[in-house]
């Protein structure tokens, strides 16, 4: 049964244009062509990237965070068995009636009970150091892969002439630069997917799962169907904006408001140009319209463009939130990351303001400076 399914799955009519056989894509005369088996290495490479990430966060990101004045903070609350049991077994957000009853039971004021629950919720928030480490790692990878992508593509004719994307398709040999560009990019997305449950959780958690799965599916499919040339263009268009986002987040956690805001505006500009202009009017035009001058519609052509359109929907989704943030900054002078961590940013800010009134000296508020001055207090995580 397995072999029957395998034979059906790899039928040429699903993957290749009519009249083309898998035998046409076998290596010959020193030319190497893509093979699905090439992608097996992306899983072990993903775990290797996780090891490299761990080393990077410890020996590069942590010292860098320290130089910015970001330290590991241990949030402690006064032990209280009654409140702790209610927090764990009932709710983390007690109603006013609950607060009144707990205050009576613990011989505390209602304000003290509210402060205890707020502090207890904040105790489980990821620290600024952890957020900085994650952003620093993503920044380093996106910078490396973008520079590598530009180096791989700058002398390729299909970067400047989209007709070259389909010249000779699908009998286009695989270049070593294309191999490593794909393998590294796919391995990175696998590593992000493996770490989603352990990294800082955000409200757009489901969107990230969809994005990573769509990215891996798209790269895997484009590899197997030998859409390598268009695939490299898709990857470079996506990576070029993320560098600025992750760097903005790093400076956000460091409390460098002016630098963070400047980088975020740069990111927003590049995002809208690359993903809402270049992607739909250049990439989708290349994959949706140009093939029809050479080929009749076939299954992989339809499936490829379906996946690209899913990505475009995600672009519009993230673009909407970016516009909301920019609108708040420009017109309301108050900005909060509407896609930030699951915990309430206002809670932590309020707690810190209370500490400040007690005379505790702070360099800046956790997760960046005050909301009315900072573009991304908890860090924006878009793709």
Swiss-Prot record:
Residues 66-127 are annotated as: Homeobox-like. Residues 130-331 form the TLC domain. Residues 342-355 have a biased composition (Acidic residues). Signal peptide: none annotated. Residues 319-383 are cytoplasmic. Keywords: Endoplasmic reticulum, Ichthyosis, Lipid biosynthesis, Lipid metabolism, Membrane, Phosphoprotein, Transferase, Transmembrane, Transmembrane helix. Expressed in the epidermis, where it localizes at the interface between the stratum granulosum and the stratum corneum (at protein level). This is Ceramide synthase 3. GO terms for biological process: ceramide biosynthetic process; cornification; epidermis development; keratinocyte differentiation; sphingolipid biosynthetic process. It is found in: Endoplasmic reticulum membrane. It comes from Homo sapiens. It is an enzyme of class 2 (transferase). Its EC number is 2.3.1.24, 2.3.1.298, 2.3.1.297. It catalyses: a very long-chain fatty acyl-CoA + a sphingoid base = an N-(very-long-chain fatty acyl)-sphingoid base + CoA + H(+); docosanoyl-CoA + sphinganine = N-docosanoylsphinganine + CoA + H(+); tetracosanoyl-CoA + sphinganine = N-tetracosanoylsphinganine + CoA + H(+); hexacosanoyl-CoA + sphinganine = N-hexacosanoylsphinganine + CoA + H(+). Residues 342-363 are annotated as: Disordered. The chain crosses the membrane at residues 32-52, 139-159, 174-194, 205-225, 264-284, 298-318. Ceramide synthase that catalyzes the transfer of the acyl chain from acyl-CoA to a sphingoid base, with high selectivity toward very- and ultra-long-chain fatty acyl-CoA (chain length greater than C22). N-acylates sphinganine and sphingosine bases to form dihydroceramides and ceramides in de novo synthesis and salvage pathways, respectively. It is crucial for the synthesis of ultra-long-chain ceramides in the epidermis, to maintain epidermal lipid homeostasis and terminal differentiation. It comes from the Eukaryota. One of its GO terms (cellular component) is endoplasmic reticulum membrane. Pathway: Lipid metabolism; sphingolipid metabolism. It is linked to Ichthyosis, congenital, autosomal recessive 9: A form of autosomal recessive congenital ichthyosis, a disorder of keratinization with abnormal differentiation and desquamation of the epidermis, resulting in abnormal skin scaling over the whole body. The main skin phenotypes are lamellar ichthyosis (LI) and non-bullous congenital ichthyosiform erythroderma (NCIE), although phenotypic overlap within the same patient or among patients from the same family can occur.
């Amino acid at each position: 049964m397995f072999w029957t399914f395998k034979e059906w799955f790899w039928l040429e009519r699903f993957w290749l244009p009519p009249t083309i056989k898998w035998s046409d894509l076998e290596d010959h005369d020193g030319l190497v062509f893509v093979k699905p088996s090439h992608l097996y290495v992306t899983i072990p490479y993903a775990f290797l990237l996780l090891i490299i990430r761990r080393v990077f966060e410890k020996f590069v990101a942590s010292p860098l965070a320290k130089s910015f004045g970001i330290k590991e903070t241990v949030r402690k609350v006064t032990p209280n068995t009654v409140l702790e049991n209610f927090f764990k077994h009932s709710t983390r957000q007690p109603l006013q009636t609950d607060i009144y009853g707990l205050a009576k039971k613990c011989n505390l004021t209602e304000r003290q009970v509210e402060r205890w629950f707020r502090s207890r919720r904040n105790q489980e928030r990821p620290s600024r150091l952890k957020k900085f480490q994650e952003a620093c790692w993503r920044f380093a990878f996106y910078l490396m892969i973008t520079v590598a992508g530009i180096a791989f593509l700058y002398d390729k004719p299909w970067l400047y002439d989209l007709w070259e994307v389909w010249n000779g398709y699908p009998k286009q040999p695989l270049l070593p630069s294309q191999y490593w560009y794909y393998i590294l990019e796919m391995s990175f997305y696998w590593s992000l997917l493996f770490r989603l449950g352990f990294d800082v959780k955000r409200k757009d958690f489901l969107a990230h799962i969809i994005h990573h799965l769509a990215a891996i599916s798209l790269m895997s499919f484009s590899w197997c169907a030998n859409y390598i040339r268009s695939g490299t263009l898709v990857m470079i268009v996506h990576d070029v904006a993320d560098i600025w986002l992750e760097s903005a987040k790093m400076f956000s956690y460091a409390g460098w408001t002016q630098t963070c805001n400047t980088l975020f505006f740069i990111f927003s500009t590049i995002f809208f140009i690359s993903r809402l202009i270049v992607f739909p009017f250049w990439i989708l035009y290349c994959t949706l319209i140009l093939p029809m001058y050479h080929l009749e519609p076939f299954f992989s052509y339809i499936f490829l463009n379906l996946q690209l359109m899913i990505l475009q929907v995600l672009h519009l989704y993230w673009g909407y939130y970016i516009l909301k943030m920019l609108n708040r900054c420009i017109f309301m002078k108050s900005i909060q990351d509407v896609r930030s961590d699951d915990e309430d940013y206002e809670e932590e800010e309020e707690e810190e303001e209370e500490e400040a009134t007690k005379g505790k000296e702070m360099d800046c508020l956790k997760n960046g400076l005050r909301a009315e001055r900072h573009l991304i207090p908890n860090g924006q995580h878009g793709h």
